[in-house]
Amino acid sequence: MAGTWLLLLLALGCPALPTGVGGTPFPSLAPPIMLLVDGKQQMVVVCLVLDVAPPGLDSPIWFSAGNGSALDAFTYGPSPATDGTWTNLAHLSLPSEELASWEPLVCHTGPGAEGHSRSTQPMHLSGEASTARTCPQEPLRGTPGGALWLGVLRLLLFKLLLFDLLLTCSCLCDPAGPLPSPATTTRLRALGSHRLHPATETGGREATSSPRPQPRDRRWGDTPPGRKPGSPVWGEGSYLSSYPTCPAQAWCSRSALRAPSSSLGAFFAGDLPPPLQAGAA
């Protein structure tokens, strides 16, 4: 897994490396990167060698500092390439405090340190340290225009959610719907008054509407409207004859024939006409 990551890093940093079948190895150094290891920053330098010897043959890779000392590196490979050649990879970790003592850094490859070898161009680590990429704690960078569009989108979404919330609350607070219009209210009132005072036809003519009920504080001497003393009870224009239906007249006649047996009955009988006389009938 680490070898694949390092190969990808080298492909991005050194896209112009020569490829193809050849008998001479070609080393190259990738741009260094900064890593945080155990709370300390270290610089990692990767060396990629193309066209190395096949497995079984000695093809070491090592680093050398400006003072002539050799530095051992961790080597991956060799691994086969797509064009039939072999590739080798090595990386070196250096403390960030000791970079000045190790520059310039050179990568070597070949049959050995005593024989003929191939080397890279010297790399100055102090200058590379300022431009090296830092993997951990790298701040995210974006254009101000992108941040502005993101803020506008968030504001629109917030307003949409707020409008939906207000609409839902208004529907829950008024489940009966809107009030009827004034014209509808007037028609309903007219229809209600018509039902309270219906007009029926009796004997081929329209009956008059019943009068308003009189208060019950009248005494025995009071006479209902439309009736004179000594006139027949069921005469034309009397109080009881104004009721349009026959059941009401029958109920009144039956109630009039019974005498009140108690004070409560006398109180309710005060609103009824006196008993029907035989001569008046």
Curated annotation (Swiss-Prot):
- Where is carbohydrate linked to this protein? N67
In which tissues or organs does this protein occur? Expressed in immature but not mature T-cells. Also found in CD34+ cells from peripheral blood, CD34+ precursors from umbilical cord blood and adult bone marrow.
> Which InterPro entries does this UniProt record tie to the protein?
Ig-like_dom_sf, Ig-like_fold, PTCRA
Q: What is its main location?
A: membrane
GO BP terms: alpha-beta T cell differentiation; negative regulation of thymocyte apoptotic process
* Signal peptide positions on this chain: 1-23
Q: Which GO terms describe its cellular component?
A: plasma membrane
Consequence recorded when altering H124L: Does not affect expression of pre-T-cell receptor complex at the cell surface
Q: What is the effect of changing R227Q?
A: Does not affect expression of pre-T-cell receptor complex at the cell surface
Quaternary structure annotation from Swiss-Prot or TrEMBL: Heterodimer with TCRB; disulfide linked. This heterodimer assembles with CD3 proteins into a signaling-competent pre-T-cell receptor complex. Interacts with RHBDD1.
**What's the protein name?**
Pre T-cell antigen receptor alpha
